[in-house]
Amino acid sequence: MNREDYITFIDGGTSDGVGFFVGNLFITAGHVFNEGQIHSIYFNGQRIVLNKNEAIFFNSPNGDIPNPNKPDVAIFNCTGDNSPLVFAEDMPIIGQELTNISRRRVVVDDIHSGRSSIFTKKEVIQMHTCIGKVTHTTDYCECHTDKILRKGDSGSPLMNGNTVYGVLIAGEPETPRCVFQSSASIVTLIRKGNE
């Protein structure tokens, strides 16, 4: 399987997002989850329901400003799924070229019914990213992408090869400016959860 196969669309009814596997963990942005909605992913032909109450770690901060005391991340244990993706334990450096990979729903016309369907196909979106600013040392990094991201891209990974440097958690509307929760901060959360 390719690295893109371990990055999947999260179907949340009225709330969409993206997440990915690192080892046997599934990672996404916490704000992807809306109250009262069932969120699920499809991986290896199987539907997996994500219940935030069963997360190893879950936090969805209030407001649009990233807060180092409230990381915007959800981490789930998915035993049996073993991804080759790994977390970087260091921050990317300014000017480093990275890729953000997302999946989006694609509206296609159903020939038989004559109506559009949003469930037929998923599109892989790759954005070339350059680190422009590193803030909060180990918690966040700010990037500028070559395509403007949208709300449904939240939770997608910032990568170099199979190494994940962060998770998309915020962006400035109508601009290529994005903020990623750093992998280094997520590794710290996982270690604390295993203590």
Regions found by a protein language model. Give the residues of each.
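Solvent-exposed, flexible loop/coil residues
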Residues: 36, 153, 184
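C-terminal cap/linker of serine protease catalytic domains
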Residues: 165-195
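Intrinsic disorder/low-complexity segments, especially N-terminal tails and targeting/processing regions
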Residues: 24, 50, 58, 181, ...
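Short beta->alpha transition motifs characteristic of CBS
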Residues: 29-34, 105, 150-151, 165-175
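Serine endopeptidase catalytic core focused on the charge-relay Asp
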Residues: 5-14, 20-23, 30-139, 159-161
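Catalytic nucleophile loop of clan PA
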Residues: 20-21, 146-169
